[in-house]
Amino acid sequence: MRRSLAPSQRIGQSTASRNAFTPPLLQKKNKRACQKDLRLDTDADEDKERKRFGLRDATNSEIPLPIRFTANSAYELAIAQVLARKFKVPIDNYVPDYGGNRCLGVRRVVVRRPLHDPQACNALVLFQPPNYTEHERMSMDPSKVLVHVVVDPLLSNILRPHQREGVRFMYECVEGKKGDFNGCIMADEMGLGKTLQCVTLVWTLLRQGPESKPTINKAIVVSPSSLVKNWEKEFTKWLQGRLLCLAMEGGTKENTIRVLEQFSMTSSKLGTPVLLISYETFRIYAEILCKYEVGMVICDEGHRLKNSDNLTYQALMGLKTKRRVLLSGTPIQNDLTEYFSLVNFVNPEMLGTAADFKRNFENSILRGQNADSTEGERKKAIEKTQELIGLVDQCIIRRTNQILTKYLPIKFEMVICVKLTAIQLQLYTNFLNSDQVRRSLADCNEKASLTALADITTLKKICSHPDLIHQKIEAKEKGFENSQNVLPSNYKPKEICPEWSGKFMLLDFMLAAIRAAGNDKVVLISNYTQTLDLFEQLARKRKYGFVRLDGTMSIKKRSKVVDKFNDPDSECFLFMLSSKAGGCGLNLIGANRLFMFDPDWNPANDEQAMARVWRDGQKKPCYIYRLVASGTIEEKILQRQTHKKSLSSTIIDNNESSEKHFTRDDLKDLFSFDQKILSDTHEKLKCKRCVQNIQTKPPSESTDCTSHLSQWYHCSNNRGLPDSILAQAWTDSKCVSFVFHHRSQAKEVVESPESAAAEAESVEEESQPTQRKRPSPPLSDDSADEDFIGF
């Protein structure tokens, strides 16, 4: 008997259990029969719905439906029927071929085609195949037809005309199109885009060739350690991530060996086909890298290979590759033996052996340069020079940075002669008159002794600031026995006093004016880290933001420091740079003013350092200031630099740049000093355009800052200076005695990189290539500049 009229809970439970799924094999027999009857009823309802919509019977359809629909989803069933129709190829009488009529692994004959369109606008074609007739094409094997080699439009659209010529020149050299050799020397001056040209060459050779396949499978770029990261950035920048490079920076020895072995052993396609490595790392692991063949090697800052006896040169010579490219932004400025080493590296035996070269060229050329040489010896020297130029001109290309005047803002260069302060003057004269200098001259027979070289360095430090020789004064070293009384009583060596140095006083005034005038940034360069310490003290005293790069900074940190300084939003006002550590390859376009605080014996080093700001990407007018102490040894160094650049060629230079080769007469001139003259350099020029140190005739309009100093503007006062900052500092500091200045071009002409494409089209049509700066023969006595007799 039921206790309540409510539904029975047992009925609810049975209903729930009946609706739950149970595998058919586990169901009882009578339950399976009931579900079968239920399905039959459902099928009958679905048939009625199909007849209603005019659909085919799903059970008799040629294509079964992927899912089963209930009576309530007839509309969905209609849509599914449309989607499930069999696809029919829209070609009459089409018979499908499932591969039964051909063998596996047989490749169809494919007609070779160039990777890029040679007829496209602004296309740079490096290889032009023969013009085949139609009859020849029909009889030739389509798989053996040569195709065009066309530079990727990604690069050809941004290459400037001189860069297009450079890429074509290097390609023809490494592919043996110019002769029986496969190497070349890219000797363009700084800022002309040697890196971009090499990136273009590497990318082209890795991707294509006349036979419609890559010419090389891997390449190695060897550079100074400070530039390895820069090369990686350049590849990423120009190729936009299309090529991954293997940059060897740091890491354990075991990991380095493993990575280099994997790179060397792999002969097929590599994920990172370009190895970026420093000279030092290559020398250490040369045994691994020289085991297997490499498609091409590029040596940046190649003047490091001027000595064929060093270990790095010999290690690179052991590399198994015939394609060698050497980059050097500075011309060869020393002896012919160094020049032979560079040419012999890229093209072995082009000039024969070292003994053959000396016998055939070097002896005759050097003999003709002697002051007591005969007319016949001079004539033979010129003939041998021209013969040598004819040989090496096939594999050397050099363009000057005058090309940049089309694309960059105007640049002003100024050589500023600064008077010594009273303290500097007394220290300088005391040292020159000391027994130390007399003994140095007496001990010097044919070449400078080590003592004389140390004395030269001491004089250079006095010209910069007395702080640099303070310890010598306190210790009463030779030459400074009587100099303690020269320093003032309130002298504190750890606190910078700009007023005790003429150059520091001028620098202090100019930095303050630049800081107050606007948002210009400044690069300060010196050959001595001690001078950088003084720069740092001055910056802290004036509360200038600064960064410093010298030899103690790691490679990874250098790139971060450069990026920070170049950031327009950065608070860094000064970039302090050691010319020995970072004078090559750095891009400091965040600044537009540069101070070269002390000169180097080698003009190439100064040129490299001063080219850091006037480069691609610079938007402001640039000002380059070279500071030298008037009448001192610094002016003598400047004169030797000027003499070297004006009378030397890229092949022949009998006047060597190193101070280790000064004779006694040279040292007597270096240790001379006249404190009354405004500029010893201007006096020795015997300038005919100036009367009593006042310029009466301007230089020719065709001259620029690459011309000889005698063809620059000469100023003995601040009138006519191109820089208002310097003009004001001249008045305020009262320590400037003379200024030489000139500009890079007559007027400011800036072209965007995009405009290079239009100019390139006209260049391609010209039959004459861009004029290259070719080495000149040795100058005879009567061919020298008349205004330069004193140097």
Curated annotation (Swiss-Prot):
Its EC number is 3.6.4.-. Residues 506-663 form the Helicase C-terminal domain. Residues 1-20 have a biased composition (Polar residues). Residues 1-53, 747-791 are annotated as: Disordered. A motif (DEGH box) lies at residues 300-303. Keywords: ATP-binding, Cell cycle, Cell division, DNA damage, DNA repair, DNA-binding, Helicase, Hydrolase, Meiosis, Mitosis, Nucleotide-binding, Nucleus, Phosphoprotein. InterPro entries: Helicase_ATP-bd (IPR014001), Helicase_C-like (IPR001650), P-loop_NTPase (IPR027417), SNF2-like_sf (IPR038718), SNF2/RAD54-like_C (IPR049730), SNF2_N (IPR000330), SNF2_RAD54_helicase_repair (IPR050496). GO terms for molecular function: ATP binding; ATP hydrolysis activity; ATP-dependent chromatin remodeler activity; DNA binding; DNA translocase activity; helicase activity. Residues 782-791 have a biased composition (Acidic residues). Its main location: nucleus. ATP binds at D188, E189, M190, G191, L192, G193, K194, T195. Residues 34-53 have a biased composition (Basic and acidic residues). It holds the Pfam family SNF2-rel_dom. Residues 2-9 are annotated as: Required for chromatin remodeling, strand pairing activities and coupling of ATPase activity. The modification Phosphothreonine is found at T22. SMART domains: DEXDc, HELICc. It comes from the Eukaryota. Residues 175-349 form the Helicase ATP-binding domain. It is found in: Nucleus. One of its GO terms (biological process) is double-strand break repair via synthesis-dependent strand annealing. GO terms for cellular component: nucleus. Involved in mitotic DNA repair and meiotic recombination. Functions in the recombinational DNA repair pathway. Essential for interhomolog gene conversion (GC), but may have a less important role in intersister GC than spn-A/Rad51. In the presence of DNA, spn-A/Rad51 enhances the ATPase activity of okr/Rad54. Belongs to the SNF2/RAD54 helicase family. Interacts (via N-terminus) with spn-A/Rad51. PANTHER family: DNA EXCISION REPAIR PROTEIN ERCC-6-RELATED (PTHR45629:SF7), SNF2/RAD54 FAMILY MEMBER (PTHR45629). This is DNA repair and recombination protein RAD54-like. The gene is okr.
